[in-house]
A protein has these predicted regions:
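Alpha-helical transmembrane segments of multi-pass small-molecule/ion transporters
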Residues: 20-340
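N-terminal leader/targeting segments
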Residues: 3-5, 41
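Short hydrophobic targeting helices and cationic amphipathic motifs
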Residues: 3, 14-16, 25-28
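Generic alpha-helix initiation/capping and coil-helix boundary signal
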Residues: 1-3, 310
């Protein structure tokens, strides 16, 4: 009798253990499937952005777009679709005063890269000015914003916008003023031109305007938000198309070493910053995810133009800028796979 009871109990335990193993197996398999589906979704969305860039580049090569059409597309993005996207996404998010610290993070990143550029430029004033301009600043509005909007939604756009507000002081005049001072010992740092440039920047005006309205809890009328959403939805496509139309590689092949040095330091610092933001900062997950992506933004789009204004090597600056876009696409896609 006792032996029969023991055998029944043993069979029962065996069935229970088998059931547990089966449940664990199903749970583990389900988790892997969800992870694979998420990775596939990320790669598909990232691939769609890259496909639009390739489309723009192909259309320019085919003669559909001319090189000067880049400036027309740039005006549409910077003055219409990007400000509309900022307005639409800010209208869906709540801003806390503590979030303003993100502006300092964007500003600090620019200062760090300017400092590295100053050191790497050595004693040659032209080299110092070139490195300051072509290592600092982030191309966020034209490049990274579509990624953060597409993967992190309104909250991601707000975090990106606050980060870019601090970054704007660097890439829209700050780096140029410091580079001018480095090139000409008689030149002095001036805040006035930077502020004038910022005031004329439609995205920056949209950042500041929506930030103030959010902090004082004033909402835009529903029809205005609806129009902004309609226009803002085109921003990702227009920004990626613009990048494709404007993409070009030029410069002296003998200067590959200088390009490699600038980009290796730029992205080496970005890797360290991304890891620190994601694993160390005591912030909510979506903040850490967005910041981990933002630090891999390409070099500021205005850098080649500012380089030309200081009589620098425009071809080399354009090559550095274009290659940084390729690297950023790869790095941002990789980071998204790991953090989402």
């Amino acid at each position: 009798m006792f032996l029969e009871l023991r055998e029944c109990k043993a069979r029962s335990n065996s069935v229970l253990e088998g059931s547990k193993d089966h449940k664990y197996s199903l749970f583990h398999t389900g988790g892997l499937l969800r992870r694979a589906e998420k990775m596939e979704a990320i790669l598909m969305k990232a691939a769609s952005f890259i496909a639009v860039i390739i489309l723009g580049y192909g259309l320019r090569k085919a003669g559909f777009f001319k090189e000067e059409d880049f400036y027309v597309l740039s005006k549409i993005v910077l003055k219409i679709t990007l400000p509309a996207s900022i307005i639409a996404n800010f209208s869906q998010a709540e801003i806390q005063p503590a979030m303003l610290l993100l502006c300092l993070v964007g500003f600090a990143g620019g200062v760090l890269y300017m400092s590295l550029g100053w050191i790497l430029g050595g004693k040659d004033r032209d080299e110092k000015a070139f490195h300051i301009l072509n290592m600092s600043g982030y191309n966020i509005g034209n490049f990274t914003m579509p990624f953060t909007a597409g993967f992190f939604g309104p909250t991601g756009v707000v975090i990106t916008s606050l980060f870019d507000t601090g970054n704007a002081f660097i890439c829209l005049g700050g780096a140029y003023s410091v580079a001018s001072m480095a090139k000409d010992k008689n030149s002095r740092f001036s805040v006035g031109p930077i502020l004038k440039t910022l005031i004329k920047s439609a995205p920056f005006d949209a950042y500041i305007g929506m930030l103030i309205l959010s902090l004082i809890h004033v909402s835009l009328p529903a029809p205005a938000v609806s129009i902004a959403q309609l226009i803002g939805n085109a921003n990702a496509f227009m920004a990626m198309l613009m990048l494709g139309v404007g993409f070009k590689l030029s410069g002296d092949k003998r200067q590959i070493g200088k390009i490699g040095k600038i980009l290796s330091i730029r992205y080496g610092v970005a890797v360290v910053a991304s890891l620190m933001f994601y694993f160390v900062l005591p912030l909510p997950l979506e903040y850490r995810q967005t910041l981990a992506v933002l630090v891999f933004s390409p070099i500021a789009a205005a850098a080649p133009a500012f380089t030309g204004d200081l009589k620098g090597d425009i071809g080399l600056a354009s090559a550095v800028n274009s290659i940084s876009i390729i690297i950023s696409m790869i790095m941002i896609t990789t980071v998204l796979i790991f953090v989402l």
